[in-house]
Regions:
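Rossmann-like adenosine-cofactor binding region
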Residues: 192-272
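Positively charged, low-complexity intrinsically disordered leader regions
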Residues: 1-51, 55, 123
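Anion-binding alpha/beta catalytic cores of soluble intermediary-metabolism enzymes, centered on
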Residues: 92-164, 259
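Adenosine-phosphate binding glycine-rich loop
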Residues: 254-255, 261-306
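Glycine-rich phosphate/diphosphate-binding loop of Rossmann-like nucleotide-binding domains
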Residues: 43-56, 140-219
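Short, structured coil segments at secondary-structure junctions
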Residues: 60, 90, 110-112, 168, ...
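Active-site cofactor/substrate anionic-group-binding motifs, chiefly glycine-
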Residues: 37-38, 42-90
Length: 306
């Protein structure tokens, strides 16, 4: 069964097809999933992700069932595989926002319904789908290739963007503090994919070098959910990595800024630059709705072929 746990499991053609279908659904909404049910399991808080998924299934003609971790017997020690067998047999799709990626993998092994990663500590693939759609809308893909800079933590967004760029053949430059590392296994995967796709990938510690000649600038919070106790240390380590006027001046003249939100002004991005690019950032957030619609339809079609 086809799940959506990471972009690694999808081909270039499949990813671009999702983006193109999202564009179609944005222009012309259709009820393509009449009476289908989506279970939404959250171990972490959510604003945009929950809204995108709940609205997506509803507007497609289905219904959503929200389940926080406190609602489930998982919180009392029931094995993930048992919960997966029950929920996966009752619904058409399962969306999960989890603390550990292993929870997703275990759930997917036993679920009869396709499982979607709506965020884990390793990957945030639905966000990157939304980013890709936004890049296309704002005409930042030239001949199918985008020039991207990612400035920030070696987190789920960095991992997912590295994988997407490697598969799609993009040019991506990543900048982060010297003591931060990308998972060797994820880096190795990206390098192998780059040999196939022709992607140009670089990793360094100078944000200005990474930003040169880029059309798309991406940043993210320095302190992810669950890292609140590390806030003081991380803010100190990321000093100098803010995206501000000087930083954006190094990128191409009409470069856009993307941020998955929530944004912490004065840290990863300045107030002035955030507001200057607010239109694209909030359209990026809205576009999650349409890529989720496309994803649900894709997974439903895959089930029909089994």
């Amino acid at each position: 069964m086809k799940h959506f746990l990471t972009l690694r499991d999808f081909s270039k053609e499949e990813i671009l097809s999702l983006v193109n279908h999202a564009s179609e659904l944005k222009k012309e909404p259709k009820k393509l999933l009449q009476d289908k049910t989506l279970a939404m399991i959250f171990e972490k808080n959510s604003t945009r992700t929950r809204m995108a998924f709940e609205l997506a299934i509803t507007e497609l003609g289905g219904k959503a069932l929200f389940l926080s971790s406190n609602d489930l017997q998982l919180s009392r020690g029931e094995p993930v595989k048992d919960t997966a067998r029950v929920i996966g047999a009752m619904v058409d799709f399962v969306m999960m926002r989890v603390n550990k990626h292993e929870t997703l993998l275990e759930f997917a092994r036993y679920s009869k319904a396709p499982v979607i990663n709506a965020l884990s500590e390793l990957y945030h693939p639905t966000q990157v789908l939304g980013d890709l759609f936004t890049i296309k809308e704002w005409n930042k893909m030239q001949n199918g290739i985008a020039k991207v800079a990612f400035i920030g933590d070696s987190n789920n967004m960095c991992n997912s963007w590295l994988i997407a760029a490697a598969i799609l053949g993009f040019e991506i430059s990543i900048a982060m503090p010297k003591n931060y590392k990308i998972s060797p296994e994820i880096w190795e995967f990206a390098m192998k994919q780059a040999l196939i796709s022709g992607a140009k990938i670089s990793l360094g510690h100078d944000k200005f070098e990474a930003l040169k000649d880029k059309d798309v600038v991406i940043t993210d919070t320095w302190v992810s959910m669950g890292e609140e106790n590390e806030k003081e240390r991380k803010i100190k380590e990321f000093e100098g990595f803010m995206i501000d006027e000087k930083a954006m001046s190094v990128a191409n003249k009409d470069a856009i800024l993307l941020h998955c939100l929530p944004a912490y002004r004065g840290y990863e991005v300045s107030e002035e630059i955030f507001e200057k690019h607010a239109d694209v950032i909030f359209e990026e957030a809205r576009n999650r709705l349409y890529v989720v619609k496309a994803l649900l339809c894709f997974l439903d079609n895959q089930k029909g072929r089994e």
